[in-house]
């Protein structure tokens, strides 16, 4: 101690070896750590192209696949359940017209008060050796062209941090779309775009996903009913027949709308909630214009002739049509 009794304050020394240099690695934020294996979907029925895609997933090879088909026929669900069964991680990215390189490959973000480069979902999938799912791919713009080297199975150079990313073994790309990347001529899928031919050419195969057969669809509907706790096999039969007739009419150009497998699942859930067949159907087809809605309802009453007399529910459900202004009750 000094003679005056006051302790000297000594500045701490800094070990030169502990100083962190500003390197590329220091600019990059940590990757995701959670498990990305999809959850198993109760009541899922494997059908159609499931076995083909299963072989691709199990091969662990890089083999980009483009899956196309009408809305609500299980394209995305099938891919997710394949990975759930294989216990393989999957990153699903929903594509929109606004999706760009920053969204896909990554960009600078504020992380704990510091500016860090946060890898995008494409980079995460490449570095982890897992599957990247580009959902609703045909809604994207030409900004998707940043994925060209990725779809070739090669690495990609991150220009923002001067870093080369090489895909780990097991990395693959799946894409789903309502069109084949040629746009929607009939306007059913407004917002879809014509994708670059060079982009499409990089997908090894294209899988065309139809709606399931009547036998398969009945299993799907019964599975939904069981999941929601309200099983009625006769109702399931009638719903599948009804949807099949509407689809045939749609393909022949007789109607502009179609009943999807997803909509049948919605009806099964509505039936479990309201306990009334016609209420469930009417609520789930109310999104169509009045003429289409009434024709679909009328068709169902012809398929299930006694539905209006036999339907019963403890409560009366009032359904108001915003187009016609009419109010009707379902007993």
What are these regions (language model features)?
Residues 1-330:
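C-terminal regulatory/interaction module of P-loop NTP-utilizing enzymes
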